[in-house]
Amino acid sequence: MKVWMAILISILCWQSSVWAVCPAWSPARAQEEISRLQQQIKQWDDDYWKEGKSEVEDGVYDQLSARLTQWQRCFGSEPRDVMMPPLNGAVMHPVAHTGVRKMVDKNALSLWMRERSDLWVQPKVDGVAVTLVYRDGKLNKAISRGNGLKGEDWTQKVSLISAVPQTVSGPLANSTLQGEIFLQREGHIQQQMGGINARAKVAGLMMRQDDSDTLNSLGVFVWAWPDGPQLMSDRLKELATAGFTLTQTYTRAVKNADEVARVRNEWWKAELPFVTDGVVVRGAKEPESRHWLPGQAEWLVAWKYQPVAQVAEVKAIQFAVGKSGKISVVASLAPVMLDDKKVQRVNIGSVRRWQEWDIAPGDQILVSLAGQGIPRIDDVVWRGAERTKPTPPENRFNSLTCYFASDVCQEQFISRLVWLGSKQVLGLDGIGEAGWRALHQTHRFEHIFSWLLLTPEQLQNTPGIAKSKSAQLWHQFNLARKQPFTRWVMAMGIPLTRAALNASDERSWSQLLFSTEQFWQQLPGTGSGRARQVIEWKENAQIKKLGSWLAAQQITGFEP
């Protein structure tokens, strides 16, 4: 009883976390948003079940269906049944398909396993469920899952799938099996390749009217033998002998959630002959098949993989101005988890790119991780009924603006501070964007080097800067004075690579000011266009003023 209470509390806590993010909509807007998404999902259902085609990725469908259910619960609507069954399925299953309850995490699985024994883990193969009925050693009937009680007659189709044994013997001669028809793959690595819309592809093949050779691209994974041998080992052996070899290969005994987690992670990264979306843990001891009912299986649960891509709600659109003056667009998101990483922001790119994506707050976007774990947008999967886009800032900035602070220069000015403090420039450890904002807000810098004049007392009394950190910052600022001349020139934004600047052998500000365009053009990786940019940069009034100021501070290389 205590275990079930713990599971219930875990589920309620999880549901509470979902309900806590209910949209702040009026009743009228909630009705409109729910109705629009409900109609779209119904259309996808009709396409899937009636025509065997899918205009949406399986993962996107699943997540938008979950989002619809969340909205319905938020605003008191009746949640819809996910994945509506085919309307004309009329063949009774000899044994009902129960479905499988999903565990929210490893802790919930551990609680479920605690009072159970003789447990086994199998891959949750991603395809379409089927019943196989054998009578007198021959395949007598194949039935689609449907609503769990009735389904479509798939006998003709399944008889053309070479991976499905058409004759069996021994205990299987008169048996009912349940399993998954899947798309056969060679070396499928779930972590790298994702779901590839396998479920919809299988459904499409099974729904086609023609009996094409493409059915031989399908396989079957048997996951249940109702009223079969009591021992799992005996079941697996008999199935393998009959030709259902995958079941024996991919069924393992487990004692606890840690063992399940290890197998789950192994299959997530291994080459498999099918697409999976998690694992199923089942007890070898099952009730008699006459007691099986849809939604009432207490002897098995699923622990799904975190999707490679997540549907995330756009909460806000923000604009940032980089040190070179380019405006970039960032989408703030309702938090989602991707590969154990909490993602709350994703870079969209330029204003033009944002306009091409047509993204507004309230939209649902598909987000995944690119190289080095950087979030990226894969698609806009749903746009809200009411869409209001913010106005981007005027494109008045360039590589020669905002060395000096002003109200319109706030973002580019901060970007310049972040750049000069980075490791590759002045190497000011312990301060990032938030720290620079705090310093500038309190002390109102005149220009990008004004921080050199801050005293230990000023740093110590800066809101947002811990007192224990202020002494470290003052030390870092003093050390920066001893940085080489080329580092200071880089901090000033000279349009050259470090390699080109080092090759120039410039060691003083006066020497740099007198260098000609021809001199810069001969440096490695510096063409005529870049050389002209250097000339424009060094002749800029703000740059000259900064050079004079650094000279007054006796920074190496700037002295007269």
Curated annotation (Swiss-Prot):
EC number: 6.5.1.2
GO MF annotations in UniProt: DNA ligase (NAD+) activity
Keyword entries, A-Z: DNA damage, DNA repair, DNA replication, Ligase, NAD
GO annotation (BP), single: DNA replication
Active site: 124 (n6-amp-lysine intermediate)
SMART domains: LIGANc
Catalytic activity of the protein: NAD(+) + (deoxyribonucleotide)n-3'-hydroxyl + 5'-phospho-(deoxyribonucleotide)m = (deoxyribonucleotide)n+m + AMP + beta-nicotinamide D-nucleotide
Lineage: superkingdom: Bacteria
Disulfide cross-links: none
Function of the protein: Catalyzes the formation of phosphodiester linkages between 5'-phosphoryl and 3'-hydroxyl groups in double-stranded DNA using NAD as a coenzyme and as the energy source for the reaction.
Family assignment from sequence similarity: Belongs to the NAD-dependent DNA ligase family. LigB subfamily.
Protein name: DNA ligase B
Annotated organism of origin: Escherichia coli O8 (strain IAI1)
Upper taxonomic lineage: Bacteria, Pseudomonadati, Pseudomonadota, Gammaproteobacteria, Enterobacterales
UniProt gene name: ligB
